[in-house]
Each structure stands twice: as structure tokens, then as C-alpha cells.
């Protein structure tokens, strides 16, 4: 999202709200206009602004053993950035938490800017990767028939607006290749602002989505996709998203602490599927461990391995211009997007994968090197892709020991 510059939510914001209502924004809910004007760009403080639904700590918590080795992690980092200190970079980039796990043990755990292990941090788009796992569980439970189901099977009102929605499948949403329009522009009219601040995300997704292209033709990062997937999940399971997460994933994974999922508003009560999962960094690391262990915890199946593998694979037989809507990817030819997960291709198929979020939130998983890297931060501090490259270097350095 782009930053909106306003000085305070006082008389100036009230005047701007009135001006907005008189200048083409009258169709937006006042609460939406107020949020855009007074909250500005999405930031980590939003965990305290949005209402939320609570997650309880697992009664069978998974406590991660420690074998701290800061020097080994520093050496791995220095191979990538010679002569630099990792802790200095983390401090300078607004990092709150940085954790490294190797073979299931915590080998590095540092906190900055007043944060500690008890600090609850917001996921931003890391939440999308949790959502992908939930979709796989709903398929396993028989609540969603298959990836190839048309989304109108669960959201028939979309077909009433435009019959072309019938051609979009659940998998198109997971791959962010639906052809649904998504435009990032400044101020109220951008889909980036709408999908983040709107107080009724169900209505937004069902009534205001438009189709621009052919399903499966192009990848375009689009926050309507997780909203629609959340609606499908909600209707298919008959449960609130947070409740389904609690029962099928949070508790079985052994989350040692509680958390929450931010809601669009108290009145609507719909989870912010695109961004709003809030937890401690040490529990976010368990998502990475779930990937490392092919969906198992202590030998018990939490998520079927077939889903864990399929969810992380690059798109097969993609057109040559599949990523044309994301031109920055041309500079990173090894980068791909799977089912709400990012990846770095490897020739032998054992790809590096990551859940990534705004301001540099990261859960990076190297199955080859048995490493998980978690970073939470106040801001990016360095380029967005640089956090993946840093984690890649740390994983390679530790894996070579």
C-alpha cells in the first residue's frame, strides 16, 4: 500500500472527510473514508486499531528447544554481506524479531526496538499462507470439493453479476491468476486501500469485483483473492475463519501462545484474510516447521503431505508472459508464486519457499538445509526481496556446516 500523508485525525480530517463525500466518494462507507484519512499507510500499529477475534494457546504446546549459536548465523550472514554485522543491520532496519531455526532448534533469537518474545506482531500477508493451508484442510475435510471447483459453486451471487465468474476456480484464486481487476492507486479509489480498510469486506468482494482478463493467463498479486477464498471457506465449513483455524491448525500445531485475527469491523465480523493474523514470532516459526516436516508435528499428521507439496509447487505450463503484471519479477527469474506462498526455484525441485508480508514480515523455509527464518519488522529497511535473499544466505551457510 502507498503512504497517505495527513497530520492528525482532528478538524483537518473532518474537513477532508466532508470534501471527499462531496467529490465522488459518496459511495464509500464513512468508516472507510475515516480510516484512509486518519490511519494512513498500513503499519504494525494496526493490530491495535482493528477489532479482532481471539485465538487460544494450544493445550498441547510445542516448545522449541534452544541451541543458540549467534556466531554461526553471523558467519552465514557475513558470507552474503562481508564485513557487516547482522545485529546492526537488524537494528537499523526496524526489525522487531529475528529468529533462525536449524533442524528444529532455535539457533538465533533476537529482539529489537522494545520487542520481546511476548510481543504480538501482525502478519500482514503472511496470513495468506496460513489461509492456503486452511483451504487444503477444508478439501481434506470434504467441505471444499476440489481445487477445480468454480468459485460460483460457493458464491453463486457472483455469477448473477457476471457469468464469467463461473470460469474462475478455487485454484485460480490461490495462484492469484483469476483475471479479476486489481489496481493500486493513491487515496480512496485504489483496490489496495479498499481491501485493507473497508469495514465490510464480504460486500466489497461480492459486489465490487470486476473481471479484466482470462483465468489462468496471468499472475497478478490481488487482495480480492484471499477475501473470496475466505468467503468460500466460511460458507463451506459453516465456521468462522478464526474458529476453523483454531480447531484445525492452531491447536494441532501446538501454538504456545494465544493470538488473534483482525476483523474488518465489529458490525461485519469478517476476518481480514489478506493481512490480519496476529501472533508471537516464535509461533509464526511453527508454520515454517510444518512445511519442513511435510505437514507433521511430532510424527502426527496435521496437514496431508500431498497438500503441503502441491501448495508450494510452481505453476506448471505457465505462459511465457505469465508474470507480465508483476514486472519486477523479471529481475528475479528464480522467484515464483504458488498457492499464496512465494518460492525460489531450484533445479532439483526442492524449492525454497516463504510467506511474506508488508514491511518485510517473513517466514522463510529451506527444506534442503532444514532452516526456518522468521523476521518481523516496523518497516522494510532494505528492499523487499533482500529479506528473502538474506534468509537464503543464512540457510545456505547453516546447511553447509
Residue locations for each model-derived region?
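Bacterial N-terminal signal peptides that target proteins for export
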Residues: 2-13
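Short active-site loop at a secondary-structure junction
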Residues: 89-99, 112-157, 161-168, 214-221
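Active-site SXXK
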Residues: 104, 122-147, 173, 229-233, ...
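Active-site helix/loop module of the DD-peptidase/beta-lactamase fold
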Residues: 122, 141-180, 210, 235-274, ...
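Active-site-proximal alpha-helical segments within enzyme catalytic domains
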Residues: 225-232, 276-297, 306, 361-377
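Structured C-terminal helix/loop/strand segments within mature extracytoplasmic catalytic/sensor domains
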Residues: 26-34, 352-401
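N-terminal leader/targeting segments and the immediately adjacent pre-domain N-terminus
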Residues: 10, 19-116, 140-144, 393-401
Amino acid at each position: 500500500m502507498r503512504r497517505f500523508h495527513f497530520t492528525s485525525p482532528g478538524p483537518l480530517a473532518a474537513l477532508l472527510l466532508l470534501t471527499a463525500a462531496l467529490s465522488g466518494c459518496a459511495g464509500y462507507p464513512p468508516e472507510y473514508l475515516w480510516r484512509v484519512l486518519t490511519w494512513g499507510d498500513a503499519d504494525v500499529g494496526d493490530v491495535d486499531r482493528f477489532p479482532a477475534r481471539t485465538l487460544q494457546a494450544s493445550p498441547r504446546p510445542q516448545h522449541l528447544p534452544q541451541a543458540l549459536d549467534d556466531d554461526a548465523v553471523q558467519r552465514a550472514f557475513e558470507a552474503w554481506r562481508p564485513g557487516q554485522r547482522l545485529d546492526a543491520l537488524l537494528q537499523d532496519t526496524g526489525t522487531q524479531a529475528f529468529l533462525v531455526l536449524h533442524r528444529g532448534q532455535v539457533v538465533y533469537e533476537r529482539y529489537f526496538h522494545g520487542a520481546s518474545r511476548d510481543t504480538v506482531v501482525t502478519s500482514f500477508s503472511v496470513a495468506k499462507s496460513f489461509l492456503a493451508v486452511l483451504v487444503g484442510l477444508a478439501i481434506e475435510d470434504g467441505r471444499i470439493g476440489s481445487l477445480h471447483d468454480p468459485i460460483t459453486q460457493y458464491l453463486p451471487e457472483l455469477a448473477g453479476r457476471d457469468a464469467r465468474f463461473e470460469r474462475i476456480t478455487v485454484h485460480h484464486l490461490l495462484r492469484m491468476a483469476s483475471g479479476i481487476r486489481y489496481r493500486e492507486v493513491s487515496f480512496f479509489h485504489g483496490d489496495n486501500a479498499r481491501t485493507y480498510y473497508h469495514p465490510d469486506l464480504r460486500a466489497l468482494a461480492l459486489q465490487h469485483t470486476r473481471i479484466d482478463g482470462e483465468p489462468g493467463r496471468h499472475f497478478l498479486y490481488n487482495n480480492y483473492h484471499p477475501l473470496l477464498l475466505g468467503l468460500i471457506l466460511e460458507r463451506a465449513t459453516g465456521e468462522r475463519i478464526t474458529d476453523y483455524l483454531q480447531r484445525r491448525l492452531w491447536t494441532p500445531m501446538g501454538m504456545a501462545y494465544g493470538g488473534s485475527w483482525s476483523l474488518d469491523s465489529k458490525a461485519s465480523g469478517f476476518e481480514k484474510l489478506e493481512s490480519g493474523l496476529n501472533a508471537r514470532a516464535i509461533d509464526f516459526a511453527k508454520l515454517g516447521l510444518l512445511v519442513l516436516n511435510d505437514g507433521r508435528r511430532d510424527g502426527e499428521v496435521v496437514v496431508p503431505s500431498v497438500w503441503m507439496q502441491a501448495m508450494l509447487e510452481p505453476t506448471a505450463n505457465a505462459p511465457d508472459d505469465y508474470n507480465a503484471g508483476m514486472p519486477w519479477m523479471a529481475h528475479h527469474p528464480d522467484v515464483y508464486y504458488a498457492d499464496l506462498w512465494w518460492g525460489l526455484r531450484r533445479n532439483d525441485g526442492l524449492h525454497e519457499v516463504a510467506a511474506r508480508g508488508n514491511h518485510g514480515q517473513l517466514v522463510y523455509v529451506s527444506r534442503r538445509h532444514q532452516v526456518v527464518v522468521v523476521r518481523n519488522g516496523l518497516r522494510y529497511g532494505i528492499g523487499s526481496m533482500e529479506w528473502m535473499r538474506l534468509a537464503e544466505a543464512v540457510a545456505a551457510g547453516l546447511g553447509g556446516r
